[in-house]
Amino acid sequence: MRVLVLVILTLFLSCNNSTKKLPILSYKIDASGAKNYYKINYEGFTNQLGEPFKMKAKNIYISNFFFTRCPSICPPMRTELISIAEEFLEDKNVMFISHTIDPKHDSIPILKAYSEATGIPDSKWQFIKASEEKTKLQAETYMTNFKPNEDGSDFYHSSFVALVDQEQYIRGFYNVLIKEEVARLKRDIQTLL
């Protein structure tokens, strides 16, 4: 009986511990089949204050791609991200990054106005931009992409956000338009804290 209790307890604890570990998803597989892990890099990005964006040690980041004129998925994504940011407002180690995919239109003043409309402090949520080429390369590091529609008035892009850990590795992807995915994101944020 004692052995059975120990076996059950061991199984429970090992299952419980394994669910707390999040995989590192930022890697590429080389020709030999080996995983090459990489960190997210923000060299060349500027925030809504016109300052170079730099990731801070000890912070985790919820990161997405958007554009300020987006008429489709960006407004509901923004609403959900505002709600999540409000929930973690007091935690200085949880930050938000939104990359514009329309750097020609989304100037620093436009990003600043967009940021102010969220009601979330600049110190919590950074809206960033870079050259079109740099933004496309950044999207690739996040394993996503975007492209303009036929007349160039809109972009096709994802409703997923990424969770980036304190070491600048991607630890998860979440569709913030799905309630269960938002709940999973919140749990995973807590796991990394």
Features from the language model and the residues they span:
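Sec-dependent signal peptide recognition
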Residues: 1-7
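C-terminal motif of bacterial Sec signal peptides marking the signal peptidase cleavage site
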Residues: 11-14
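N-terminal "domain-start" segment that seeds a small globular fold
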Residues: 20-57, 76-79
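Short loop/turn microsegments at loop-to-beta-strand junctions
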Residues: 40-41, 60-61, 158-160
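Short active-site neighborhood of thiol/selenol oxidoreductases, capturing the structured segment around
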Residues: 53-81, 97
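Structural microenvironment flanking redox-active thiols in thiol-disulfide oxidoreductases
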Residues: 78-138
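Thiol-/selenol-based redox modules, centered on thioredoxin-like
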Residues: 149-193
